[in-house]
Amino acid sequence: ECRYWLGGCSAGQTCCKHLVCSRRHGWCVWDGTFS
């Protein structure tokens, strides 16, 4: 199960497509990609 946008995340969790875990904030943010 992937983590949705602004969902809490840690290094061991995978965010959903086009999202990346923000180390600074500790939640999933958009990684800037569309494809």
UniProtKB/Swiss-Prot annotation:
Outcome of mutating Q13A: Reduced ability to inhibit nociceptor cation channel TRPA1
Impact after mutating S35A: Reduced ability to inhibit nociceptor cation channel TRPA1
Compartments in which it is found: Secreted
Domain of life: Eukaryota
Impact reported for V29A: Decrease in ability to inhibit Nav1.2/SCN2A and Nav1.7/SCN9A
UniProt KW NADP keyword: no
One term under GO cellular component: extracellular region
UniProt PTM comment: An unnatural amidation at Ser-35 provokes a 14-fold increased toxin ability to inhibit Nav1.2/SCN2A and a ~2-fold decreased toxin ability to inhibit both Nav1.5/SCN5A and Nav1.6/SCN8A.
Disulfides per UniProt: C2-C16, C9-C21, C15-C28
Effect the entry attributes to changing W5A: Reduced ability to inhibit sodium channel Nav1.2/SCN2A
Pfam families (UniProt xref): Toxin_12
Keywords: Calcium channel impairing toxin, Disulfide bond, Ion channel impairing toxin, Knottin, Neurotoxin, Pharmaceutical, Potassium channel impairing toxin, Secreted, Toxin, Voltage-gated calcium channel impairing toxin, Voltage-gated potassium channel impairing toxin, Voltage-gated sodium channel impairing toxin
Site annotation Pharmacophore for Nav1.7/SCN9A: residues: L6, L19, W27, V29, W30, D31
InterPro entries: Huwentoxin-1
Keyword Ion transport: no
Predominant localisation class: secreted
One Gene Ontology molecular-function label: calcium channel inhibitor activity
Effect of mutating R23A: Reduced ability to inhibit sodium channel Nav1.2/SCN2A
Free-text tissue specificity from the UniProt record: Expressed by the venom gland.
Note on domains (UniProt): The presence of a 'disulfide through disulfide knot' structurally defines this protein as a knottin.
Misc. comment: The primary structure of the mature peptide is identical to that of Beta/omega-theraphotoxin-Bp1a from Bumba pulcherrimaklaasi (AC P0DQN3).
Protein family: Belongs to the neurotoxin 10 (Hwtx-1) family. 54 (ProTx-1) subfamily.
Protein function: Ion channel impairing toxin that inhibits voltage-gated calcium channel Cav3.1/CACNA1G (IC(50)=53 nM), voltage-gated potassium channels Kv2.1/KCNB1 (IC(50)=411 nM), all sodium channels tested (Nav1.2/SCN2A (IC(50)=60-104 nM), Nav1.5/SCN5A (IC(50)=76-358 nM), Nav1.6/SCN8A (IC(50)=21-133 nM), Nav1.7/SCN9A (IC(50)=51-95 nM), and Nav1.8/SCN10A) and the nociceptor cation channel TRPA1 (IC(50)=389 nM). Acts as a potent and selective blocker of voltage-gated calcium channel Cav3.1/CACNA1G, but not of Cav3.2/CACNA1H, and Cav3.3/CACNA1I.
Protein name: Beta/omega-theraphotoxin-Tp1a
Upper taxonomic lineage: Eukaryota, Metazoa, Ecdysozoa, Arthropoda, Chelicerata
